[in-house]
Amino acid sequence: MRLDKFLVACAVGSRTEVKNLLKAGRVTVNGKKEKSAKLQIDEKIDEIRFDGQVLEYEEFVYYMMNKPQGVISATEDPKHRTVLDLLDDIARSKEVFPVGRLDIDTHGLLLLTNDGQLAHALLSPKRHVDKTYLAEVKGIMTQEDVEIFAKGIPLKDFTCQPAKLDIVSVDSEKNQSKIRVTIAEGKFHQVKRMVGYCGKEVVDLQRLTMGTLILDENLERGEWRRLTKEELENLLVSIA
């Protein structure tokens, strides 16, 4: 790998900035100052330092985000803020993208990565990766609805796979319910449409899980962090 490409991948700066940093003598390779951007290095063997700090190359990165409402699950959008706008410059420089989509008014767990193979595996219909949502509903969900979800709901354009519906709480006075829904698909507005089929309306929707990943309760809306080693290992094992 070229030295300048390595430095860009380590988020030291853009390619132009990296060339200037090399000229300034701020980069060393195996203890010697190096000014050539074209130098071929072995990222697994050579020790590269920037301002004395050892740099470690990461091919892939994995971030958990608590996506807020009002933000688009995309890398760019002409009208709305995207989830990438919530990242810092270093995280954005890794060229990550959201794995799947959450509607603009849905909040909760979102995985961002630059690992296309993992993203493809998690989104593949063949994998049946479960996703769990917590929904606040206008209307009273019933045991009959639980059975309807379990059979597979026939919508206009497709029939849903059997889904698990748990009724968390019911408030008869306010005509509200709180439910937990687990689905293996992720079609457009699916949970909202499934609830709508039962004659009720989702007024708030939060994703809690995706496969083995569970939303960190300590993450405020709009916050993100790297996956822990254990979280990543469990995720990789689950799609192996």
Q: Which sequence ranges carry the predicted segments?
A:
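Basic, flexible Lys/Arg- and Gly-enriched helix-loop patches that mediate nucleic-acid binding at interfaces
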Residues: M1-A240
